[in-house]
Design a protein with these regions (language model features):
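Conserved N-terminal beta1-alpha1 strand-loop-helix module at the mouth
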Residues: 1-89, 97-124
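Active-site phosphate/pyrophosphate- and oxyanion-stabilizing loops and adjacent acidic/basic residues
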Residues: 93
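Active-site-adjacent C-terminal substructures of enzyme catalytic domains
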Residues: 141
Length: 141
């Protein structure tokens, strides 16, 4: 499957509660979203897994890739299209060894050096740091 990175949605349950999440993700896909990343920092592994399963059904229905933030285990368990990691997570090369060539690997970077290293180590795409401050990224440039 050719991946379309045009409009990449990152979920945030601090902005949209869980009851609304599934409906909002489906609306986003119908509105042109081409990729969805499930990003949860404050829930249990079991809740994260259950949420991922629910979102996988929605994204699969529309043939939109589901990316799991930080959690390689959950990405593998739900057969997500890929995983997205940051600079303080397991090294890119190790994650790539775990997930293999058939899953996507995205990496958040904040410098040219980090970007070059991530690509060298096997990243399929890069997430470049926040430009404007948000509720979760107050130190944006």
């Amino acid at each position: 499957m050719k991946i379309d990175y045009t409009l990449y949605l990152v979920t945030d349950s601090h902005i949209v509660n869980r009851q609304e999440l599934y409906k909002r993700v489906e609306q986003a896909i119908l509105g042109g979203c081409t990729m969805v990343q499930l990003r949860e920092k404050d829930i249990s592994s079991l809740d994260f897994y259950r949420q991922a399963l629910e979102l996988k059904q929605i994204t699969e229905k529309y043939r939109v890739p589901l990316i799991i933030n930080d959690r390689v285990d959950i990405a593998l368990a739900v057969k997500a299209a890929g995983v997205h990691i940051g600079q303080n997570d397991i090294p890119v090369s190790v994650v790539k060894d775990i997930i293999g060539r058939n899953m996507l690997l995205g990496v958040s970077v904040t410098s040219l050096n980090e970007a070059e290293q991530a690509v060298k180590d096997g990243a399929n795409y890069l997430g470049v740091g926040a430009i404007f401050p948000t509720k979760t990224k107050k130190d944006a440039v």
